[in-house]
Amino acid sequence: AQALAAALGWPFQEGDALHPPENVAKMAAGVALSDDDRGPWLDRIKAWIAARREAGEPGVITCSALKRAYRDRILGSAAERLGVALVFLAAPEAVIAARLARRRGHFMPPTLLASQFATLEAPGPAEHPLVVDATQPPAAMAAEALALLAAVDG
């Protein structure tokens, strides 16, 4: 996502940085978040997107948005979704597990990955996701996302 934002020259926001302290503490303790826990975080993500739109400025933000209901909460109505692209990074759990094992300094332990995949509802055609092969290196993922975005804007 950072490589995509850099390639586009757009501001980047790491969605995990918007988690309330209670969520960070819970995940750091190895406890999966509930839908209720995620609510304030999803609202912060939505507010960031809304602020960019209101300012007429683009941006890239990361968010696991594991369920359709979460994505609907973030993206809002059809009118609110105009100009917003949902890029879905698709990879098997084993690939993500290997990446998490190498990640340092993040509050979410790799042990929570299984609960995230159990919760995951991959976006369907009605959500018009731009699906990127996340088994690739980051630069290749960014290039694929750029190509998909260009095709949409085409």
Which residues fall in each region the model found?
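Conserved substrate/cofactor phosphate-moiety recognition/catalytic segment
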Residues: 2-46
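Active-site catalytic pocket residues across diverse enzymes, especially alpha/beta-hydrolases
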Residues: 8, 77-78, 104
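Short, amphipathic alpha-helical "lid/cap" segments that border enzyme active or binding sites
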Residues: 42-46, 138-149
